[in-house]
């Protein structure tokens, strides 16, 4: 499994392609969170402009074969895991744990905030 950190300075063509892939990968979240797609687009705009957004991708066969993702917000006021998702077929293989560990390291916070949909509270 490969892990890629996407941050400020990403090539705009690569960012557009990753946004497209993540919209597909996270499509079901649009049913759980109002305006999720618009939020994801905003994250990518912020990603190209500031250091406050980071994305960690877990990939199998190259950067576009996404198996898991963690979307982070890191500001002086907030260190937060906004989204953490592993594709169902790749769950229970340690990918989520690895994404969580890498998120904690990048956020430099042992107890970051994390957004969890009410539907998924029992999983945590």
Predicted regions and their residues:
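Short amphipathic alpha-helix that is part of the acyltransferase structural core
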Residues: 1-42
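Conserved GNAT acetyl-CoA-binding A-motif
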Residues: 107-119
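Conserved acetyl-CoA binding element of GNAT-fold acetyltransferases
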Residues: 77-88
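Conserved acetyl-CoA-binding loop-helix of GNAT-fold acetyltransferases
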Residues: 86, 92-106
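A short helix-loop-beta-strand connector motif used in the catalytic cores of GNAT acetyltransferases and
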Residues: 43-59, 80
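GNAT/GCN5-related N-acetyltransferase fold signature
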Residues: 57-58, 70-74, 86
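Extended, composition-driven regions rather than compact fold-specific motifs
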Residues: 123-124
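Glycine-rich phosphate/pyrophosphate-binding loop shared by adenosine-nucleotide-utilizing enzymes
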Residues: 62-69, 79
């Amino acid at each position: 499994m490969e892990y890629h950190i996407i941050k400020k300075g990403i090539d705009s063509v690569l960012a557009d392609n990753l946004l497209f892939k993540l919209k597909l990968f996270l499509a079901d979240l649009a049913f759980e969170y109002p305006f999720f797609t618009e939020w994801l687009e905003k994250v990518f705009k912020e990603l190209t402009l500031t250091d406050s957004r980071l994305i960690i991708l877990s990939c199998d066969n190259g950067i576009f074969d996404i198996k898991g993702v963690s979307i982070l917000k890191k500001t002086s006021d907030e260190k937060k895991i906004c989204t953490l998702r592993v594709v169902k077929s790749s769950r229970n293989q340690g990918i989520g744990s690895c994404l969580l560990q890498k998120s904690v390291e990048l956020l430099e916070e042992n107890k970051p905030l994390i957004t969890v949909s009410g539907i998924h509270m029992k999983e945590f």
